[in-house]
Amino acid sequence: MTEFKAGSAKKGATLFKTRCLQCHTVEKGGPHKVGPNLHGIFGRHSGQAEGYSYTDANIKKNVLWDENNMSEYLTNPKKYIPGTKMAFGGLKKEKDRNDLITYLKKACE
């Protein structure tokens, strides 16, 4: 696993719009969609967004989200949390993950 390196929030926003927005929101108080609202995700344990129905796998994983484990998760979500209902296949390019996480850090705080 490689260490997270801050990327381009602008490129990350574009990635979010094309790869994530169909299932997630980021604004405070935003609705859950197919996936949970991601506001406040960094520093929160997996499976803990209030009002969202997670799989047991997400709850039991109990990972405290930070930039590094988020990058590992986004590489291959179903490998990182077997049993997750996240259908997204992952972002294979480290640069894309860094850009997306940089955007999420700003958009979700």
Swiss-Prot record:
Q: Which key words are in the record?
A: Electron transport, Heme, Iron, Metal-binding, Methylation, Mitochondrion, Respiratory chain, Transport
Which PROSITE patterns does the UniProt record give? CYTC
Looking up SUPFAM superfamilies in the UniProt record yields: Cytochrome c
Primary localisation category:
mitochondrion
Q: Where in the cell is it found?
A: Mitochondrion intermembrane space
Mention one GO molecular function.
Answer: electron transfer activity
Q: Does the keyword Heme apply?
A: yes
An annotated GO cellular component = mitochondrial intermembrane space
Q: What does this protein do?
A: Electron carrier protein. The oxidized form of the cytochrome c heme group can accept an electron from the heme group of the cytochrome c1 subunit of ubiquinol-cytochrome c oxidoreductase. Cytochrome c then transfers this electron to the dinuclear copper A center (CU(A)) of the COX2 subunit of cytochrome oxidase, the final protein carrier in the mitochondrial electron-transport chain. Isoform 1 (CYC1) is the predominant cytochrome c during aerobic/normoxic growth.
What other note does the entry give for this protein? Answer: Present with 7330 molecules/cell in log phase SD medium.
Family note: Belongs to the cytochrome c family.
Provide the protein name.
Answer: Cytochrome c isoform 1
Tell me which species this is from: Saccharomyces cerevisiae (strain ATCC 204508 / S288c)
Its organism's taxonomic lineage begins at:
Eukaryota, Fungi, Dikarya, Ascomycota, Saccharomycotina
